[in-house]
Amino acid sequence: MVVAETLPSGLRLVTEQMPHVRSVTVGVWLARGSRHESDAESGVAHFVEHMLFKGTTTRSAREIAQTIDSLGGQLDAFTAKEYASYYVKVLDEHLPVALSLLSDLVMRPAFAPDDVAREQSVILEEIKMVEDAPDDLVHEVFAQQFWSRHPLGRPILGTPETVAALTADELRRYFARTYVAPNFVVAAAGHLDHAQLRDLVQRAFETLPAGAPGASTAPPSVTPGVVTRYKDIEQSHLCLGTPAYPQAHADRHAMYVMNTILGASMSSRLFQHIREDRGLAYAVFSHLTTYSDAGMVTVYAGCATEKVSQVVALTLRELRELREAEVPADELRRAKDHLKGSLMLGLESTSSRMSHLARQELFFGRHVTFDEMLASIEAVSAVDVQRVAADLFRDDCLVATTVGPESGPALTADGLRI
């Protein structure tokens, strides 16, 4: 059973009891990410996430590591474009200590100047890793072109220039205005009792500043076009995509079914026609990225540089086919079954259930039950898939980016026509 409530401080708590397991995963989710940064402070949200593990006013970094190791637990965090998450998985008997550790991290970071300088170097190396990983880099270049005039287009890590300019004082100021009760969701799933956890949370977070949630940013608009980044590597990497619906859109499940048919499974059209039938690529797939007010559907392929134009032409053909013709009944059935199975299999652990609870609270403000989701997927028709494809796959908002050698034929905007 899922229980959700807002505590007097403004902090939101949502739990799901899973009596058949012995573990508990609890996460502290911050409803602020890289899209809420200014241009000058790009990367600050991710930098702060790193620093929370470098010591608090009551624990050193070593003591943090020793505490979680002594529990036999797992502690981790990540920063996304619309939120950040700090989470721990432990046996149920260790929940009080784990929650105390989490609250210490998100309420009392030290931001010691020496640690800030050292971690700054670590993050700059992390940025270089992306630059040296072309399959990651092409997605970054794609997002930067796709939403070139909006914070969603900026890299979560920031740029070398913005990260190098951030100081301990700037990190403290960002932390003070952002890490406040109304921005937090505490989500937990596993062998737990909601009332007992509520008492633990209230005690652990009783000094969390009330504050006020920050202002939202305006929805983004797409900048269509083609961007090529030359790299001396063995193959070319391609991203091609269009806008998609936001997270809570009424047609989101029809969009998920459409994406499954397009390129999100082994039997998908892109995988079969580009890899299996023609051997043009090892990796080829489509994926959806959805936010509170925007989204994008992206096709990725890694192929021989001289084959890029052929892969693009085949991809555009598949987009056109989805837009102009209804999918056959057997293909629709297979896509819906795949989507439902993936959903259920992906929510068997306490960690995945905790993340699901938190995202539901952040994007919907309520818990959408499994039965609701399964029924919504099952209700998708071939007409729905075609209607959504016709709505999303438009020539006036196509974006393509490539990362690869200079030897290949250059893509042009004129060649991007569905």
Model regions: which residues?
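Extreme N-terminal starter segment of soluble prokaryotic enzymes
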Residues: 1-3, 11-12
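Charge-rich, well-structured scaffold segments of protease-associated domains
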Residues: 2-6, 17, 54, 61-219, ...
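Active/ligand-binding-proximal structured segments within catalytic/core domains
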Residues: 10, 17-68, 179, 250-262, ...
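Flexible, small-/acidic-enriched active-site or ligand-binding loops
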Residues: 225
